[in-house]
Amino acid sequence: FSNPNTVRWYQDKISELIRMGVSAIKCDFGEAAPYNGLYANGRTGFHEHNLYPLRYNKALWEAVRNSSPNQEGVIWARSAWAGSQRYPLHWGGDASTNNVGSTGMLGDLRGGLSFGLSGFSFWSHDMGGFVTESPDDLYRRWLPFGFLSSHTRAHGAPPTEPWLISESFTDAFRECAEMKYKLMPYVYAQAKLCTEQGLPMVRALFVEFPEDAGAWLCEDQY
């Protein structure tokens, strides 16, 4: 993405999809640009590694925006760097299907809180995790977390469609989905506020309660 000709070629391909009716494009990976690579601008990956996802986000976001009716559309990006705040939105990548350590549901929340403190208003995650089949109890617990995030997605390597799990799980999924639809006026209002004031939708507690010493130590609530 340091080559303008490549960017134009890529954007033309994306624009064809948008004109077909696609409204969102997944901006996957982007964080693995090799340090020893040589880029079109003559610089090595040592200098370009972090710029790669920024340029990737920008190229895709511009293609989606410029090809969409009323300049609407969204990217669903995994990698980012300083400046990617302009190109919403991002998600937490491939989470493990557990609730321990730094890679499962708790790790996703920690990442989302950190992301919000870095100036990103919108952030999402894969409900239930991605890597392996999610345990029923974990996926159920992940549902309200996912539906009460700004953008909601169920996605994973094994199928995550609720009707493939059980009837009772489908009922729980539907209940959370209906809850979010009822809350959409509030969600839209908060989204507008966040874009105007630079706030994250998922906020670390000390953003709202800076005088509370305990809020500065809390990493599993928002």
Model-derived segments and spans:
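Catalytic-domain carbohydrate-binding cleft regions of carbohydrate-active enzymes
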Residues: 1-222
